Amino acid sequence: MGEFLPTTYEEMKARGWQQPDFVYICGDAYVDHPSFGAAIICRTLESRGFKVCFLSQPDWRDVEAFREFGKPRLAFLISSGNIDSMVNHYTVSKRRRKKDLYTAGGQMGKRPDRAVIVYSQMARQAYKDATIILGGIEASLRRLAHYDYWD
């Protein structure tokens, strides 16, 4: 540990890896700090000897963005980030927010609404037989018997 997690194919290859064990797909910008759950999960896996790559705010309109590292040996780990993507995008009165506090420069539009669903669909489209593990606040809110306030 000590180096940042690979966030590009070139960084993964520089470590001498052919394939990651896990690819963590996150709706937030990459922040390697223990106040971010993604960093804790990735660093814990890394400390156990797993090869973890971090795919931050991939372009959800382009399946090739989800093929950045190739198919992970074990699974895609998918989270919308520190906050539900709908809460991140809209106020309680359903007005669009002006800034994304978990994106560099506060730029809006780097993650889709319902990011966990969209990222999962794109990972599945990229690799039909890949294992997908969901986590985070959004994944826990978007379950089978879920009333979606936004609709």
Stretches with model-predicted labels:
Residues 1-16:
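Short N-terminal or domain-adjacent regulatory/targeting segments
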Residues 10-11, 29, 37, 42, ...:
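Glycine-rich beta-alpha loop elements in corrinoid/cobalamin-binding modules
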Residues 21-23:
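Conserved beta-strand elements of the Class I
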Residues 44-50:
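A short, Lys/Arg-enriched amphipathic alpha-helix followed by its capping loop at the start of a domain
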